[in-house]
Curated annotation (Swiss-Prot):
Main location: membrane
Keyword match Hydrolase: yes
Chain positions with Cysteine methyl ester modification: C189
Organism, as annotated: Hydra vulgaris
Keyword Hydrolase annotated: yes
Placement of sequence motif Effector region: 37-45
Gene Ontology cellular component list: plasma membrane
Name the UniProt record assigns to this protein: Ras-like protein RAS2
Gene Ontology molecular function terms on file: G protein activity; GTP binding
Length: 192
């Protein structure tokens, strides 16, 4: 149990190009907003924080959104323990790409559900919004993931996105351990 108190989590930030994945990650790690868009190939960050009174060492992979780097996706999808599915509320096509990322993660993991959080970034640009909160919430329900809106620029729900993902990983781990414990307790030896 003590290993669970001080644990490393491999988080992966995925989504289309220009949705603010790097801005979200850098705001979380360094409390700094990156104004200029510089396409990422792949960057890795580390941060230690306390989430629900437990120390968490976060190993965050900020991925390329551009299609030309899609060959790298299977590898980081294999190793990630949880995923932030990021789209921009001002970019309809980035929202439409999310089910493809979700499906690809589940295919690579060969599982029906996995810890993921749907993040609608750039919520500060309300006048440029092309994706409503209601339709994003509906997609979250359909994909069986929770949804939140964030603004890397105004630091709205930045910490919440990463912390909620760690909680989702912890809950998934707890759910997979519970049935094993119940099986162990129910074993009985019958002598005939």
């Amino acid at each position: 149990m003590s290993g669970d108190l001080d644990r490393q989590y491999k988080l992966v930030v995925v989504g289309g190009g220009g949705v603010g994945k790097s801005a979200l990650t850098i705001q979380f790690i360094q409390s700094h907003f990156v104004q200029d868009y510089d396409p990422t190939i792949e960057d890795s960050y580390r941060k230690q924080c306390v989430i629900d009174d437990k120390v968490a060492h976060l190993d965050i992979l900020d991925t390329a959104g551009q299609e030309e780097f899609s060959a790298m996706r299977d590898e980081y999808m294999r190793t990630g323990e949880g995923f932030l599915l990021v789209f921009s509320v001002t970019d309809r096509s980035s929202f439409d790409e999310i089910p493809r990322f979700h499906t690809q993660i589940l295919r690579v993991k060969d599982i029906e559900e996995f810890p993921m959080i749907l993040v609608g970034n750039k919520s500060d640009l309300e006048n440029e919004r092309t994706v409503s909160t209601a339709e994003a919430q509906e997609l979250g329900r359909k994909l069986k993931v929770s949804y939140l809106e964030s603004s890397a620029k105004q630091r709205i729900n930045v910490d919440a996105a990463f912390h909620d993902l760690v909680r989702a990983i912890r809950n998934a781990n707890k759910a997979s351990v519970e049935p094993l414990r119940k099986k162990e307790k129910s074993r009985r030896c019958i002598v005939l």
